[in-house]
């Protein structure tokens, strides 16, 4: 089998040296992706296309599908390469190849020709088109908007019968631009923004700020692995996980409510910039869109950017949510994003949309920056190729109950502000308050002879914190969902 890879048009308008470099990189990327399907596969680069030849017919569909997902490819032609002697020979071969497709259809013939011949491309189109029209009674020539277009390519003494055309994702080959670090949360925005930078030729590494234990991290790892495996598997990339619960706890405990959102983002940018510097990455990528939430106003984004010299790229800055969700659906991350949990208690109730630098800096003086340094130092760096195996590990299950027994105590893990606004009172059982950001350090001080029923408004944080406590060896925890 043979495929002809057509280059993304922006590649073809580059200078000769740049174009050759892009083609060389794309050829290497294709080899890296396809070597898993057929070890005998050959990839040959030319000035205006790349040929892929393989022997294993069983891998035809898999190879074709993989090619449509490699950045830098405009479209793929699946072809049959045969010798020919003259125009009549071209017609006879086209008749055998296309007869069934043209029955009862309107059609036209389009020919591209390279080399020296005693006929032109138009001569071949007329001869082959006329012959097909005469020999297939139910077919009819229609030069504008035909139902079927017969594509032929003539190169020297070879005829390429084009059996199918398949659209690629376009863009630049990965590796033609410098590396970036994507701040991935598993939601709609970060997945789409990561894809857009891969499509633009960047090797995208991932940085994840963990707020909810192993279950949360496993979910986001699956999104990152999916994106890499589907669009970026030609290159090795890193997945860096940072346990950000201590940072969130420090913010919730010491920072004024209205400034929490901006300061949390500033802390994330500081941490990600340190990771980027450690690995020689040139820029950060976020999924922020202008005005989508309170921290994404121009004033707040400027204040967030000010904490780092690292370039921050925001490919979705002018996109609306509907457009982003449609893109997520196209690339296959929509289902991941819809099931990714939201975290109660992390977002302030009255966030500022126009933060003042002096106020932000005054609030940050209350923050213990040694906590930020520590979580960055302890960040977990994994080769993304290992994630498939690691995410298969069993996540400890935790029981969810809607009632309680005589030895049970409800543990309200919401933030202090939420508890003050909506105190939890349940008849017949004691309720103890312990904000989620203190669980890792204070849960062991509670009476371990009791069974603790963790509760929060949405039930997401309580489940994740119960999973975390189970992983730490506390088996006396359940999730309370009345």
UniProtKB/Swiss-Prot annotation:
Listed A to Z, the keywords are: ATP-binding, Cytoplasm, Disulfide bond, Nucleotide-binding, Redox-active center, RNA-binding, Thiamine biosynthesis, Transferase, tRNA-binding
Q: Where is the THUMP domain?
A: 61-165
Q: Name one Pfam family in it.
A: THUMP
Q: Where in the cell is it found?
A: Cytoplasm
Q: Which GO terms describe its cellular component?
A: cytosol
Biological processes annotated in GO:
thiamine biosynthetic process; thiamine diphosphate biosynthetic process; thiazole biosynthetic process; tRNA 4-thiouridine biosynthesis
User: Which reaction equations make up its catalytic activity?
Assistant: [ThiI sulfur-carrier protein]-S-sulfanyl-L-cysteine + a uridine in tRNA + 2 reduced [2Fe-2S]-[ferredoxin] + ATP + H(+) = [ThiI sulfur-carrier protein]-L-cysteine + a 4-thiouridine in tRNA + 2 oxidized [2Fe-2S]-[ferredoxin] + AMP + diphosphate; [ThiS sulfur-carrier protein]-C-terminal Gly-Gly-AMP + S-sulfanyl-L-cysteinyl-[cysteine desulfurase] + AH2 = [ThiS sulfur-carrier protein]-C-terminal-Gly-aminoethanethioate + L-cysteinyl-[cysteine desulfurase] + A + AMP + 2 H(+)
Q: Which residues bind ATP?
A: 183-184, 265, 287, 296
**From which residue to which does the signal peptide run?**
none
Q: Which Enzyme Commission number(s) are listed?
A: 2.8.1.4
The disulfide bonds in this chain are: 344-456
Question: Which residues are the active-site ones?
Answer: 456 (cysteine persulfide intermediate)
Spell out the molecular function terms from Gene Ontology. ATP binding; CCA tRNA nucleotidyltransferase activity; tRNA binding; tRNA-uracil-4 sulfurtransferase activity
Its UniProt pathway annotation is: Cofactor biosynthesis; thiamine diphosphate biosynthesis
What SUPFAM superfamilies does its record include? Adenine nucleotide alpha hydrolases-like, Rhodanese/Cell cycle control phosphatase, THUMP domain-like
Decide whether keyword Cytoplasm is in the record.
yes
Q: Which residues form the Rhodanese domain?
A: 404-482
Q: Which family does it belong to?
A: Belongs to the ThiI family.
Q: Which NCBIfam families match?
A: ThiI_C_thiazole, tRNA uracil 4-sulfurtransferase ThiI
What is this protein's function? Answer: Catalyzes the ATP-dependent transfer of a sulfur to tRNA to produce 4-thiouridine in position 8 of tRNAs, which functions as a near-UV photosensor. Also catalyzes the transfer of sulfur to the sulfur carrier protein ThiS, forming ThiS-thiocarboxylate. This is a step in the synthesis of thiazole, in the thiamine biosynthesis pathway. The sulfur is donated as persulfide by IscS.
Protein name (Swiss-Prot/TrEMBL): tRNA sulfurtransferase
Gene for this chain: thiI
């Amino acid at each position: 089998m043979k495929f002809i890879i057509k280059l993304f048009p922006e590649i073809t308008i580059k200078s000769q040296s740049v174009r050759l470099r892009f083609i060389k990189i794309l050829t290497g990327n294709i080899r890296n992706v396809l070597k898993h399907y057929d070890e005998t596969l050959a990839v040959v680069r030319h000035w205006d296309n790349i040929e892929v030849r393989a022997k294993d017919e069983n891998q035809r569909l898999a190879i074709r599908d993989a090619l449509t997902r490699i950045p830098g490819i405009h479209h793929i032609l699946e072809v049959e390469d045969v010798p020919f002697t003259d125009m009549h020979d071209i017609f006879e071969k086209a008749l055998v190849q296309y007869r069934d497709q043209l029955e009862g259809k309107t059609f036209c013939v389009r020919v591209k020709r390279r080399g020296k011949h005693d006929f032109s491309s138009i001569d071949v189109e007329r001869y082959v088109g006329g012959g097909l029209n005469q020999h297939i009674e139910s077919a009819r020539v229609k030069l504008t908007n035909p139902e079927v277009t017969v594509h032929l390519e003539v190169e020297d003494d070879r005829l390429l019968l084009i059996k199918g055309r398949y659209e690629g994702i376009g863009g630049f080959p990965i590796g033609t631009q410098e590396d970036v670090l994507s701040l991935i949360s598993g939601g709609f925005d970060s997945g789409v923004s990561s894809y857009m930078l891969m499509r633009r030729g960047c090797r995208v590494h991932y940085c994840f700020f963990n707020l909810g234990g192993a279950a949360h991290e496993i979910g986001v790892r699956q999104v990152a692995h999916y994106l890499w495996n589907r669009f970026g598997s030609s290159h090795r990339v890193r997945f860096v996980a940072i346990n950000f619960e201590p940072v969130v706890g420090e913010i919730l405990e010491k920072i004024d409510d209205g400034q929490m959102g901006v300061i949390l983002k500033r802390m994330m940018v500081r941490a990600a910039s340190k990771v980027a510097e450690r690995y020689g990455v040139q820029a950060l990528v976020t999924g922020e869109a202008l005005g989508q939430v309170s921290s994404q106003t121009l004033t707040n984004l400027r204040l967030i950017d000010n904490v780092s010299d690292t370039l921050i790229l925001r490919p979705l800055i002018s996109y609306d949510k509907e457009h982003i969700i449609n893109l997520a659906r196209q690339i296959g991350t929509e289902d991941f994003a819809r099931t990714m949990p939201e975290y109660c208690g992390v977002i302030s109730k009255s966030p500022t949309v126009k933060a003042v630098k002096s106020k932000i800096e005054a609030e940050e003086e209350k923050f213990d920056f040694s906590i930020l340094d520590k979580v960055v130092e302890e960040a977990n760096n994994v080769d993304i190729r290992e994630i498939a195996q690691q995410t298969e590990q069993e996540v400890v299950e935790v029981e969810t109950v809607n009632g309680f027994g005589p030895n049970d105590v409800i543990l309200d893990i919401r933030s202090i502000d939420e508890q003050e606004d909506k105190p939890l009172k349940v008849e017949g059982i004691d309720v103890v308050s312990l904000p989620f950001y203190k669980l890792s350090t204070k849960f062991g001080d509670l009476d371990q002879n009791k069974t603790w029923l963790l509760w929060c408004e949405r039930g997401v944080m309580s489940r994740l914190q119960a999973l975390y406590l189970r992983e730490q060896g506390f088996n006396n925890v359940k999730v309370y969902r009345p």
